[in-house]
Amino acid sequence: MAHATPGAYYIPTSSYWPLVGSLAMICTMVGAAHWINDGDGLLARPLFFTGIGIFVVMLFGWFREVIGESLAGRYNNQVDVSFRMGMMWFIFSEVMFFAAFFGALFYARMLSVPWIGGEGHGALTNLYIWSGYTASWPTNGPGVVGGVFETIPAWGLPLVNTLLLLSSGVTITFAHHMLRSGRRKALLVWLGATILLGATFLYYQAHEYMEAYNELNLTLHSGVYGSTFFMLTGFHGLHVLLGTIMLTVMWFRCAKGHFTRDNHFGFEAVAWYWH
C-alpha cells in the first residue's frame, strides 16, 4: 500500500453499499421469519436466499472499494487506528450478543426451570399452575412444546467441529507468521488450510442441523432449549461463514501480493475475527 499524506485523514465519498446491506438484511430476516412460521410459504425461501445473495454481493463490492482505496495510498496511520478500533468494537458487539443469549440459557437452566418445577421461592408456580411438572434439562417446558425431542450427543459431530475450529486457530496463526516472515507460498498453504477447515465445519454443522430436525425432532419449536440452541449455534455458524468468506478474500489478496511484512492489517483483522 502506498502512503497517504501525514496528517491528512481520508474521508471516503458517499457509498450506496450500506443501503444494499440494509436491503439484504430486510430480505433475509423477513424470508427467515416466514420460513420458520409458515413452513413452505410461497415467498419465504426465495426471499431468504435473495437476501443472502444480495448480502454476498454487498460484501464483495464493499471489500473491493476499501481494497482499492488502500492500494491507492489513501490511508495513513490515523485511518489505520480507526480501522483497528472499529474491528475491536465489532468483535466486542459479537461477544455481547453471545453473552446475552448465554445469559438467557443460564437463566432458563438454573432459575426458571427449577422454579416451574417447584424449587426455591417459585414453589407456588408449580403448585397452582404447573402441578405435577418435574424439572429436568434439557426440556421444552411443562407444555411439551414441539413434542418430545432428543439432543445431539456431545461426543459426535460437536466434538469433531470443536477440533476443526481449534485446528483452524493454529493454521491461521501459522499463516500470520508466514506473512510476517515473507514466506508467501507457505502463507497461501496455511491460509488455504484454514479456509478448508472452516468450510468443513460449516458442512458438518449443516449436517448436524438436518439430523436434529429430521431424526431428533429438535427444532426451533422445541421450547427454550431448542430456541437457545439454534440461536447460539446458528449465530456462531454465521460467524464462521463470514470469517470463511473474509479468509477467502485474504487468500486472493495474498496471492496478488497485496500485503507486506509490516503493513497487513486487513489480514490481521480477519485473524482477530477468526479467533
Can you annotate each of these PLM segments?
Residues 1-274:
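...captures the hydrophobic TM-helix bundle architecture rather than a specific catalytic motif
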